[in-house]
């Protein structure tokens, strides 16, 4: 416990970069189930909470489906096509994709628990800088997104679809949400084979070519 608190204190003092402690490591630290450790994690790393039992059951179901043999015979090219439709707008992988969410290339993608936990329950771990805020504007609009930059005059908000620069005089109320900008249920609409293809692509060590249907776009 003491060594964990020393590590978190070093992150707090900027002696250790926050990004050096991945979501995988944070999940391991949460396993201490120590109130002091969890409180310090929430302070210096970001929002963390336990995964609900219903979602844990979903994760176990996917793990039963995604056997080593099934993944070995999955189609990673089709998996990339699914990734481009569902993930690439927000995440980068192998140098391709968006920058709204964390870059996936260096994450612990070969760990099935890590991969599924982040897809099934994205709000369990939200690193600093990726917390979602809810912004109510005087014209009645309510926006959700990540704060990219803020000054006394302006707030730059990255939503799921666009980067918006708001005049702070337009903002009536702003609050932090405990939900991730990444939507839940990413796997719910996919068939078992599509899930296997997507996971095989995400957990792979190298890039694969785009399907011809996407290369021309």
Where are these regions (language model features)?
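Short glycine-rich, low-complexity segments
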Residues: 117-125, 129-135, 139, 191, ...
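Extended, hydrophobic alpha-helical segments in both membrane/secreted and soluble proteins
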Residues: 3, 83, 87-90, 100, ...
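C-terminal capping alpha-helices of c-type cytochrome domains
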Residues: 32-65, 141-153, 161-164, 180-181, ...
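The canonical Cys-X-X-Cys-His
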Residues: 79-94, 104, 198-203
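Gly/Gly-Pro-rich "capping" loops immediately C-terminal to redox-active cysteine motifs
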Residues: 97-121, 133-177
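Long, ordered, helix-rich scaffold segments
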Residues: 1-82, 107, 138, 214-217
